[in-house]
A protein has these predicted regions:
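Bacterial N-terminal signal peptides that target proteins for export
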Residues: 1-8
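Loop-centered beta-sheet repeat module
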Residues: 182-191, 200-229
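Short, conserved, GDST-rich strand-edge loop motifs in beta-rich repeat architectures
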Residues: 166-184, 243-245, 249
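Blade/loop signatures of beta-propeller domains
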Residues: 21-34, 73, 131-133, 194-206, ...
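Acidic, Gly/Ser/Thr-rich repeat motifs that build Ca2+-stabilized beta-propeller blades
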Residues: 21-174, 223-226, 231-239, 289-327, ...
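N-terminal signal peptide c-region/cleavage motif recognized by signal peptidases
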Residues: 16-18
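Conserved blade-ending motifs and adjacent loop-strand segments that build the rim/top face
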Residues: 218, 330-351
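Beta-propeller blade signature
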Residues: 121-131, 180-194, 248-250
Length: 374
């Protein structure tokens, strides 16, 4: 039985046994959707990855990693997870499978690492065992560590060549460092699976620049996905009061924060020099007021009619999923907001073609499943 068939079978069993009894129909322009509960009892889940055997791996920000079955059963926490700085917005963040996972059982975790009273975004890789992580190795550490509790990022995405992108925030109090190539603050990094630097990274030969940097001038990227046709890295980042953005993170480009932004300070004043400046990229799309974006996926399946090719973005502040129709010029042609009524932390397309959501509601957080109600 292939992975898709296994997931479909498990979903049917879950419905039959009442595991998905908590469900409702939500409206969408392309047809009604069924929103059902896959699992509950999670605390601040942050990242999700689907395993070949039909289970999920889910991170919880306090520092736990669990297996979750398609029927919603939570495992005990997997041991061996690196120590995390679970304060403010810090903790255990994203999880990604190595492209060769079926052969090497290797996973990658992003997390906030405590360092002598400070903290930084870090990435570890490990071999996934039955109930523990083995051969854990930290392969990337954001420099410098900062005495701040906010804006760690962080999403992990592998490209088609097997390079790993790591998104990082400006740490809140260090916004000007997003323009400084001598730090990893407010950057997207691109590394090899062992943490070494690809020879074709854009700043490898620039004196004083961190060689891992791929793009810069970012505020706090909490959503990233590869475009299914082009293979380019699409990201979104939180603005301050307004100014959430979607960008294509391209090699060596400057995305402007905090020099340009469509947002304002939380207490009202303007930020930086305006909304545009030569040498700085404009977003493909932005939100004013903020939706609080987190998690992002391109929908490539046929299970939900009319959604194929759309970009899906979770929203913490507005408690929605934004469905964006993208034109051939990468412009957003249309946006629909689908009400979830819970803070959406992550968005993933499942092997069964349904859309899986992590909600971030503290100890009452859940995994939800969006599917066609037809």
């Amino acid at each position: 039985m292939n992975l898709r068939s296994a997931w479909l079978a498990a979903a049917l069993v879950a419905v039959a046994t009442g595991a998905s009894a908590q469900e409702k129909v939500v409206r969408s322009e392309k047809g009604n959707l069924r929103l059902s509960t896959v699992a509950s009892g999670l605390e601040a889940p942050w990242g999700l990855a689907f395993l070949p055997d039909g289970r999920m791996l889910v991170t919880e920000r306090p520092g736990r990693l669990r297996y979750v079955t398609a029927g919603g059963q939570l495992s005990a926490p997997i041991t061996g997870v690196p120590k995390v700085f679970a304060v403010g917005q810090g903790g255990l963040l994203d999880v990604a499978l190595d492209p060769a996972f079926p052969d090497n059982r290797t996973i990658y975790l992003s997390f906030s690492e405590p360092v002598d009273g400070k903290a930084r975004t870090a990435v570890a890789r490990a071999r996934l065992g039955a109930d523990r992580l083995e051969d854990v190795q930290v392969i990337f550490r954001q420099q410098p560590a900062v005495d701040a509790r906010h804006h760690f990022g962080s999403r992990l995405v592998f490209d088609r060549e097997g390079r790993l992108y790591v998104t990082m925030g400006d740490r809140g109090s260090q916004r000007d460092s997003a323009q400084d190539l001598g730090t990893h603050i407010g950057k997207v990094a691109r590394i090899n699976p062992d943490g070494s630097v690809p020879a074709d990274n854009p700043f490898v030969a620039r004196e004083g620049a961190k060689p891992e940097i791929w793009s810069y001038g970012h505020r706090n990227i909490q959503g990233a996905a590869l475009h299914p046709a082009t293979g380019e890295l699409w990201t979104h980042e939180h603005g301050p009061r307004g100014g959430d953005e979607i960008n294509i993170a391209r090699a060596g480009l400057n995305y402007g924060w905090p020099v340009i932004t469509y947002g304002r300070e939380y207490h009202g004043p303007k930020i930086g020099e305006g909304t545009a400046k030569a040498g700085m990229e404009q977003p493909l799309h932005y939100w004013v007021p903020s939706i609080g974006p987190s998690g992002m996926a391109f929908y490539t399946a046929d299970a939900i009619p009319g959604w194929k090719g759309n970009l899906l973005v979770g929203a913490l502040a507005s408690m929605q999923v934004a469905r964006l129709e993208i034109g051939p010029d990468n412009k957003v042609r249309h946006e629909e907001r689908i009400a979830i009524a819970e803070r959406v932390r992550d968005v993933r397309q499942g092997p069964d073609g349904a859309v899986y959501l992590l909600t971030d509601m503290g100890p009452g957080s859940r995994i939800l499943r969006l599917s066609s109600a037809r």
